[in-house]
Amino acid sequence: MSAVTQHIIDRGDGARVELFQARPSAPKNGAILFVHGNQGGLLLGGKEAVDDGSLVRFSSRLGVTAAAISQPGFGASDGPADFCGPTTQQAIVAALEFLKQQPSVDPARIVLYGNSRAAVASAMVATKVQGLRALILTGGVYDLREAYGSSSRGLQQAIQKEAGVSNESFLDRSALHHSHRIRAETLLLHGKYDDRASVDQAERFSEALAQVGVPVRFYALEGGHRLPREQVTPILREFLTRIFAPDATLH
């Protein structure tokens, strides 16, 4: 069974980023990095993926290194939170660079997986980092200004506090407007009845990626913001098994 270890890495500006990692006993293979969403005030960060067994489960079943980071302001990562903005994105970039240096990881086979607000940040990271093998996004928004206008008062206040509402702030968090910079194969999962992030956001983002030649698959599932595991699991299994499959060897 994969053992979970905790690491504190440098974000690149002296700030700390907490990362948890489970490594398989298998030979060198790929890696998957999980980025958590809003945790309802618990601020567990990446430890959530440790506590619910996700890291060990993904690592052991796929034979890959599975890691989870704590966003700024969560877990043991230095804050403050900036609602999916440049600081959060830099933390994710630092975690990806850490994984690339691990002896168990093939740096050309790294998958980034962001859920909810982490999908916002992870999509933006994919516009800046070249070489990602794949990108998985669930329940995200990809045009934050548009989403802001129809969001709940509580979410609007969080955006105002953490990010601000300038044009630059919205653009820094809106991958739809930077889709031409993404190269990684992308899997988009979204609930048809999501009341926090409209499924239309994912559909439009999928279309934008396809238009610039990115291999993309979009699934609108029967659910709300929290997607039913019985629908998500088979899609992830098929996608990740293919992504991490050993390269064919010609004799």
Residue ranges and their predicted role:
Residues 28-29, 38-76:
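Short substrate-entry loop that stabilizes the transition state in hydrolases
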Residues 182, 188-190, 194:
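Short beta-strand/loop motif that positions the catalytic acidic residue
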Residues 203-251:
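C-terminal catalytic histidine-bearing segment of alpha/beta-hydrolase fold enzymes
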Residues 140-178:
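Mobile cap/lid helix-loop segments that gate and shape the active-site cleft of serine hydrolases
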Residues 119-130:
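Short glycine-enriched nucleophile-adjacent loop
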Residues 82-103:
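Alpha/beta-hydrolase active-site loop
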Residues 104-116:
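Alpha/beta-hydrolase fold nucleophile elbow
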Residues 1-27:
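N-terminal cap/lid segment of alpha/beta-hydrolase-fold proteins
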